[in-house]
């Protein structure tokens, strides 16, 4: 199974430097709306076994152009799944605050250096977030090797999934960058997950998904596509 991970496009809160978390009515910015249209073109046309989307408006707005212009035209009865397990981190009382102000809190160092130990006041822990996100991935990984699933979620959620895929401890997940409207692709068809694409904002994803399957048994770096 190949898993396409998409972070929502640039949002109104991104533009303001605000940690929106799960606050309602946070929509895409004008920049984000343009990104969502370009994303639809980049994704192109490929069969989707499942499309799972965070409940936050900005995530559905990000994928809507592709869903409406490509997926539903080919499969009119296809239904995306709004999955609360892929929701943004519950940042609790940090939600709605300026990142510049939050960076001055003593807990900020924990977020950056030991995120597995961070539990947001009146919210959830980063480790809890990873656990719920990975429960979705483990379910999708049961799909046949030939299938492709798509997740539309948030930066920290996707970073935690990528960290797990490459066997990196959660405390190191801040080393991973996931930009708005970026696409990452993981392959779960082998013994261990593999990263095919990471934080990409330019590639034509269809070309990657339609490329010949890579060998499950690699030694010496493999022969490429």
Question: Model segments located where?
Answer:
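Acidic, low-complexity terminal tails and accessory targeting/binding regions
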Residues: 2, 89-100, 142-147, 164-225
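Short, hydrophobic/glycine-enriched beta-strand segments
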Residues: 2-8, 151
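Loop-to-helix element that buttresses phosphate recognition and phosphoryl-transfer chemistry
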Residues: 10-61, 65-66, 119-134
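Short active-site segment of divalent metal-dependent hydrolases/proteases
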Residues: 11, 157-158
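Phosphate-coordination/substrate-recognition cap region in phosphate-metabolizing enzymes
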Residues: 37-109
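Active-site signature of alpha/beta-hydrolase-fold catalytic machinery across serine-
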Residues: 65, 160, 164
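Short glycine/proline- and acidic residue-enriched helix-loop micro-motifs
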Residues: 109-128, 217-220
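Short basic (Lys/Arg) and small-residue
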Residues: 154
């Amino acid at each position: 199974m190949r898993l396409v991970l998409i972070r929502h496009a640039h949002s109104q809160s991104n533009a303001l430097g605000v940690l929106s978390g799960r606050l309602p009515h946070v929509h895409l910015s004008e920049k984000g709306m343009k990104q969502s249209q370009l994303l639809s073109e980049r994704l192109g046309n490929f069969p989707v076994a499942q499309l799972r989307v965070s409940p936050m408006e900005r995530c559905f707005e990000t994928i809507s152009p592709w869903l409406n212009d490509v997926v539903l035209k080919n499969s009119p009865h296809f239904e995306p799944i709004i999955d609360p397990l892929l929701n943004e981190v519950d940042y609790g009382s940090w939600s709605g605050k300026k990142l510049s102000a939050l960076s001055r809190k003593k807990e900020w160092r924990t977020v950056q250096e030991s995120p597995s130990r961070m539990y947001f006041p009146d919210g959830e822990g980063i480790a809890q977030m990873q656990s719920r996100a990975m429960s979705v991935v483990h379910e999708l990984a049961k799909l046949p090797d030939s299938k492709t699933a798509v997740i539309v979620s948030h930066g920290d959620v996707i970073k935690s999934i990528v960290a797990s895929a490459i066997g990196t401890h959660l405390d190191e997940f801040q080393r991973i960058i996931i930009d708005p409207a970026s696409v990452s692709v993981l392959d779960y068809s082998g013994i261990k997950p593999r990263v095919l694409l990471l934080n990409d904002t330019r590639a034509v994803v269809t070309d990657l998904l339609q490329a010949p399957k890579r060998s499950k048994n690699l030694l010496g770096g493999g022969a490429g596509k």
